[in-house]
Amino acid sequence: MATGTPAHELRELSAEELTTRLHEAKEELFNLRFQNATGQLTNNRRLGTVKRDIARIHTVIRERELGLSSAPGDEA
């Protein structure tokens, strides 16, 4: 079963690590879509899992922009 990264784990990452994870997830999604189009994709569920991971990362980034949560090590 393909499982994504829980939000609480993403909240523990720094902004740079989140950006890196986001870039990697977008690359993986591109590759999965390409495999799906060519009929080589064996795990269709992985597409949805990666999409949800991207959404979670965007959510954590937005929470920090709004001040709803802080990056680890940032004590206010």
Swiss-Prot record:
* Single GO MF descriptor: structural constituent of ribosome
Keywords from UniProt, A to Z, are:
Ribonucleoprotein, Ribosomal protein
Q: Does the keyword Ribosomal protein apply?
A: yes
CDD domains found in the cross-reference section: Ribosomal_L29_HIP
- A Pfam family of this chain: Ribosomal_L29
Q: Chloroplast: present as a keyword of the record?
A: no
InterPro entries given in the database record? Ribosomal_protein_uL29 (IPR050063), Ribosomal_uL29 (IPR001854), Ribosomal_uL29_CS (IPR018254), Ribosomal_uL29_sf (IPR036049)
- Any one Gene Ontology biological process term? translation
The organism sits in which domain of life? Answer: Bacteria
* GO CC entries: cytosolic large ribosomal subunit
| PANTHER family reported for this sequence | 60S RIBOSOMAL PROTEIN L35/50S RIBOSOMAL PROTEIN L29, LARGE RIBOSOMAL SUBUNIT PROTEIN UL29C
Query: What family is reported?
Result: Belongs to the universal ribosomal protein uL29 family.
Concerning NCBIfam families, the annotation shows:
L29
What is the protein named? Large ribosomal subunit protein uL29
**Organism this protein belongs to:** Corynebacterium kroppenstedtii (strain DSM 44385 / JCM 11950 / CIP 105744 / CCUG 35717)
Q: What does the record give as the organism's lineage?
A: Bacteria, Bacillati, Actinomycetota, Actinomycetes, Mycobacteriales
